[in-house]
């Protein structure tokens, strides 16, 4: 027998020929029942991912192909290294930071080759990520918010009751670090690459002039990147924000809710990482970039 319970918030109305995922239960008498779990979205997801891969390679060429390799490495690190370590009880923040640093180094080497430009970008990224982590911890302590107040933490609490030694209190800041990593890498690599070009065109420029150029370039990037991060965090929680707004809460109640405090910490801590990556990368690059040329494999 196959059951499909359909309601406004659950169940899937199916038509003849549509594929679905079933949950099959086997009883002691050998009988079976099946319940419709969800649409089978595997084919649709494969098409969407295929279009993404195709667009990346067609537009980006060799660099696009390299970026896909870097993305694959990132996913492997997150799903086969980070999550298993956290499930075994490893220190949440230290593990996340070290994995992000590893992802940064591997990604930079894949995209930029082995050179001082890449090293400077990687150092700027790691430094910016570390400051985002520290700012997140400070903000979390100041606002008295911890990982136990996250909206989706209840299933993890149930998981801990089964004996899984998962540390929950650092998940908020850990999520901030992971979310900000891509933007921080983007800013750091852009500044390092730009200063490399400036040095190539004007090799007589000293470190101070290169640093000023890096700051000028970085200021133009900070505004859009900060906007991107803030909007990304707010957009991901838009439905819950609408729900809070519909309650007609007093503004002080609204801004004091754990959810709003969590979103503020997430958005601002990520932006801090991007902002501070600008002077850090500009400083590191201006001190180091003039001494070596890249050994890139194109």
Regions found by a protein language model. Give the residues of each.
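PDZ peptide-recognition modules
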Residues: 1-2
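Extended, hydrophilic extramembrane loops/domains of integral membrane proteins
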Residues: 6-43
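Transmembrane helix-loop junctions in multi-pass membrane proteins
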Residues: 29-31, 59-65, 110-115, 237-254
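Alpha-helical membrane-interface segments at transmembrane helix boundaries
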Residues: 36-42, 61, 65, 69, ...
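Transmembrane alpha-helical segments that form the functional core of multipass membrane systems
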Residues: 50-158, 169-179
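Generic detector of multi-pass transmembrane helix bundles and their immediately adjacent loops
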Residues: 133-264, 268-269
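Hydrophobic alpha-helical transmembrane segments of polytopic membrane proteins
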Residues: 173, 273-277
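Residue-level detector of conserved catalytic or cofactor/ligand-binding positions
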Residues: 289-298
